Amino acid sequence: MTEHKSGFVSIIGRPNVGKSTFVNRVIGHKIAIMSDKAQTTRNKIQGVMTRDDAQIIFIDTPGIHKPKHKLGDYMMKVAKNTLSEIDAIMFMVNANEEIGRGDEYIIEMLKNVKTPVFLVLNKIDLVHPDELMPKIEEYQSYMDFTEIVPISALEGLNVDHFIDVLKTYLPEGPKYYPDDQISDHPEQFVVGEIIREKILHLTSEEIPHAIGVNVDRMVKESEDRVHIEATIYVERGSQKGIVIGKGGKKLKEVGKRARRDIEMLLGSKVYLELWVKVQRDWRNKVNFIRQIGYVEDQD
């Protein structure tokens, strides 16, 4: 009988290297928020990938960066704590970018862990094959990685091969989650993240990190209809105007795009109501951050 592998794998890397894209690719559902703006992942989003011979729980950590506020402190704490809780580490980098100080900072952290560390060079669809080997050799000069695998999370290139390699390093173990469970976050959290993703796609650079979303109410009204009420929090009145848009057009578009994805997630029709409120300097208010679900209760 074939042995069954199971384990927890942390995905770590600088902001915007494609960690969320990878999680969504291997899970087959949108679990982690995707945006072209850095530092958009705020919690350890666990995506559960179940195959006949293995179950891998991916922990998509917030991108490593120097904290600028209480929320940033929390994001960094989550990223570092994750390294001590898992069976393998994916260090993801952009194959089409130079090694930066952020990468060097992470490598120094990784040198001190006993867990297997896989270097995953993402976005190989954006580089010429001749440029790949020199990049790999450059990373090898920093530390000895357990394995080095180039992939494109967006295009799906080499992703299955990486999963096969990863499985060989995981311990034998049971399924921790049922076959049909794809995340350990409650549905309300994922719904809030979908709404936040749409706002990030539709607003300008000044908005992203000032956005928080709380799902106030989520009720199944019938077999095929769910009623959701959510509040979008910003830090300034001017940001509220940007999110709402002229004549409410921007907010309507956010709702339209979010509703489409939420209906796919829940498998039923969704009636979505959105409000925008100003909560000044909310990213520095620990109690408020906890209230909207971005901080786990910790001792």
Swiss-Prot record:
Span list, region G1: 13-20
Region (G2): 39-43
Positions contributing to GTP binding: 13-20, 60-64, 122-125
Chain segments carrying region G4: 122-125
Lipid bilayer topology: Peripheral membrane protein
GO cellular component, one term: cytosol
Keyword check for Membrane: yes
UniProtKB keywords: Cell membrane, Cytoplasm, GTP-binding, Membrane, Nucleotide-binding, Ribosome biogenesis, RNA-binding, rRNA-binding
SUPFAM superfamilies the UniProt entry points to: P-loop containing nucleoside triphosphate hydrolases, Prokaryotic type KH domain (KH-domain type II)
Annotated compartments: Cytoplasm; Cell membrane
Domain KH type-2: 203-280
Main localization of the protein described in the UniProt heading: cytoplasm
Subunit structure: Monomer.
Family of the protein in this entry: Belongs to the TRAFAC class TrmE-Era-EngA-EngB-Septin-like GTPase superfamily. Era GTPase family.
Designated name of the protein: GTPase Era
Name of the coding gene: era
